[in-house]
Curated annotation (Swiss-Prot):
Any one of the GO BP annotations: translation
Protein name: Small ribosomal subunit protein eS8
Keywords carried by this UniProt record: Ribonucleoprotein, Ribosomal protein
Annotated PANTHER family: 40S RIBOSOMAL PROTEIN S8
Disulfide bond annotation, renumbered to this chain: none
Species annotation: Methanothermobacter thermautotrophicus (strain ATCC 29096 / DSM 1053 / JCM 10044 / NBRC 100330 / Delta H)
Subunit structure: Part of the 30S ribosomal subunit.
InterPro entries per UniProt: Ribosomal_eS8, Ribosomal_eS8_CS, Ribosomal_protein_eS8_arc, Ribosomal_Se8/biogenesis_NSA2
Amino acid sequence: MAIWQGKSMKKPSGGRAKMNRGKRKYELGREPAETKIGDRRVRLIRTRGGNTKVRLASDTRINVVDPETGKVEIAEIRNVVENTANPHFVRRNIITRGAVVETNLGNVRVTSRPGQDGVINGVLIRE
């Protein structure tokens, strides 16, 4: 079943609200990408205007910026350490923006949106 992002059918009192029009195509949503650790897999999604969006299903590498030197390196992701979006994402190794992942260079905070951009970028965290 599709995800509908339109107005709720409940009134503030909890009663049922009547629709004054039907649902529209632009109110449709999609399932979240839920990017995991694994071999690189991407899904191309057609968006409005015929544009494309790259959904990253899984990847093992991350582009890491060292804030002190400004140098970018590619690191291997080992596991997810922290995720403020959902505490259960840590257990399931799901990567979202703001997640902290453990790499061979150290802990890295993800700055890109893997489900929207199709790439994982991050900033090295100095302890």
